[in-house]
Amino acid sequence: MADWKETLLTEAAAGCKNTAALKETLKAMAAHPSLSPDNVLLLRMQMPNATAVGGYKAWTEWYRRTLPRDVKPVVLLKPTVGVGKDAYITEDAEQNAVSNKSVEFATTCIGYAPVHLYDISQTIPDDGSEDVKDQYPLTLDDIVTGFRSLMDCDIATVSETGKLAYYNAEKNTLELATENKSLIAEAAICGLTRFEAERRLPDTNKLYVGLVAECAANVLLRINAIEPSNDILFFAAWNGAEGKNPEQYLELLNQIYWTSRRAMTRLRYAANQPVSFDFDEVCLLNQLMTSNNKERLMEQLRELVKHTEVPVLIEAANNLCEKLDMFDDAKVRQIYEDRCNRKILTQPIYII
């Protein structure tokens, strides 16, 4: 997939051409929450009805399913750790070039590489086939409990003057004029994605922050089997009459993805529920986790970030560091054992 960059930009523009198209893209992101927007767009282009994708060995060895010889794989992108070369000009103490020859040396770097994956619909179950893990959606109570733990907020009963459930950030209070648990959970998720969007984009205009937050909430609600009651309100104003360029659309989808995934990770952790690893994070674990030394692995990830210009890969490495930092030594040992036992493969989802 030599022209994957152009393909992604074309698909991003099509997926954000108007509010209706954006909603469909958000649904696709919610259906494949472990995939980055890059891979969601590529998957939707090749196999729009896919439900769970995994590698050949994941299906045949772990899930004990058969893949027919003539089945056609989907081609996605995976992070690949390799060796590149950095070039530097020799300088004196005043940083003036003193040599016209650059000094080259090898350095560990990270980039994208194509990978062949297959949807579960292309496999044939055998006797003793393993079930594919689902996304473990949080319950409505889990969402509210996790949100209150994260925000350390109060709950207040208010008169019905506007929204039936709303997180008041200024008062740090979940204001309720209803007992409908679904609406309360939705208010909690909207409050959390707004908090995460503002944290990610502190110097950005409020319209864009609001758009990222409402779209991230839409994805997060769908992941947890809650039908959003709110529409996407900010897109038309942000998009304008003439629209944006494809790079801006792809950046928007990335910001939505990063905001929703961090909110989900923090919410699951606060609610005492298993944390899931994204596809890019699993690929990095497979390549880098050669021991159960958490600090060593995190240092490797931080070093990799210095040697890539791909924002999605930078985020994947940073997010993996953040998740590892949540776990105690026993949990890290379990991840390492799973990796050694080939349980961490290019699976549809890895949860611990």
At which residue positions do the language-model features occur?
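N-terminal accessory/interface modules of nucleic-acid-binding and processing proteins
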Residues: 1-284, 349-352
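Generic structural signal for well-ordered, non-membrane alpha-helices
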Residues: 190, 258, 296-299, 315
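Amphipathic alpha-helical repeat scaffolds
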Residues: 285-289, 302, 318
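Charged, low-complexity interaction regions
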Residues: 290-296, 305-315, 325-332
